[in-house]
Amino acid sequence: MTDDTASDGVLDPGELAAALARFGGTESERRTVARQAVDLADSGRYRSDSGRRLTVDLVVDELADAAGGSPADRWNWWIGVLSFAYGGYEAFAVGRYPGSGE
């Protein structure tokens, strides 16, 4: 794998935010998760670790495996899985988003 994986960023944040609506949450929450996903894709880290390109379908499939929760809950669950498997994904977790009250 080469270092050009950072140019892999074909993940469309608007498309992902719309796809995340199936998990509920607010528009702000879905947009925040989508931005974190784009940052992860742009970093090239996921592709380097897993050998797979981050796509809308892949993110939605992975988040569907979570036991439940909002898009941010599901995203943070998946980031936890990636952190356990590969280490160092904590920076991509969603801590706060507009309207989260935190």
Regions found by a protein language model. Name each.
Residues 1-102:
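Haloarchaeal acidic low-complexity proteome signature biased toward cell-envelope/secretome components but also
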